[in-house]
A protein has these predicted regions:
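Short pre-active-site segment immediately N-terminal to the catalytic Zn-binding motif
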Residues: 91-112
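Catalytic glutamate of the conserved HExxH
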Residues: 111, 115-123
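Post-HEXXH active-site segment of zinc metalloproteases
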Residues: 106-107, 121-151
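Short coil-to-beta-strand
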Residues: 78-87, 115-116
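Short loop/turn segments at strand-loop or loop-helix junctions that form parts
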Residues: 86-92, 122
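Conserved binding/catalytic microenvironments
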Residues: 91-96, 135, 140, 161-165
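A metal-dependent hydrolase signature that marks the N-terminal structural subdomain at the beginning
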Residues: 1-80
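Long, well-structured alpha-helical subdomains associated
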Residues: 2-9, 16-20, 150, 154-177
């Protein structure tokens, strides 16, 4: 993987905006207030801030679980799950450059919303975290998360978002009851 390919300053501004919008959409969809537990239980990083093991080939992002503990806490009962959303700049930029119909802003919004759906499902125990990376997540679970992501984003009037839905059309299937 080409580790030299990172988001530039303008692209990072687009990432920041997509993070804000996706967080708001996630909070609204899952009926969480901005002050609830989710705010401090995850972080979003781009390639330049990732450790070597957090960079992967293939997916556009991955969620990695870490164990957090408050300062001066020695008991295991004081630990908590902390999730890091690791954006893979190179894969995202490559997909956008190779696919005429994809534009960075709506693509980032979809990716970030998708990853935050995973985080919420992990934190609410709707999905078990026992996988090392996104590629290990079961196909059924991945399709379920794409379905939820589509459900969250469909009513949002974002220019060129339909092209992103088209890009993911094989993943966005109706959820089985």
């Amino acid at each position: 993987m080409n580790k030299a390919c990172h988001f530039n300053t303008q692209e990072l501004l687009k990432v920041d905006e997509a993070v804000k919008v996706s967080e708001e959409l996630i909070n609204n969809y899952f009926k969480m207030s901005s002050g609830q537990w989710l705010k401090n239980r995850y972080d979003i990083k781009t390639a330049k801030d990732l450790a070597d093991h957090e960079n992967v080939e293939g997916p556009f992002a991955q969620v990695i679980k870490y164990e957090g503990r408050k300062k001066d806490a020695t008991l295991g009962s004081s630990s908590f799950s902390f999730y890091k959303v690791c954006l893979q700049d190179s894969a995202i930029l490559s997909a956008v450059s190779k696919t005429d119909s994809l534009f960075l802003e709506p693509f980032l919004l979809y990716i970030l919303t998708h990853e935050l759906v995973h985080v919420v499902r992990f934190l609410k125990f709707k999905q078990r975290y026992e996988n090392k990376n996104e590629a290990d997540v079961t196909l059924d679970e991945e399709r379920r998360v794409h379905f939820i992501t589509h459900k969250i984003l469909k009513p949002v009037p974002i220019l060129r978002l339909n092209q992103v839905f088209e890009f993911y059309k094989d993943w966005i299937l109706f959820e089985k009851s």
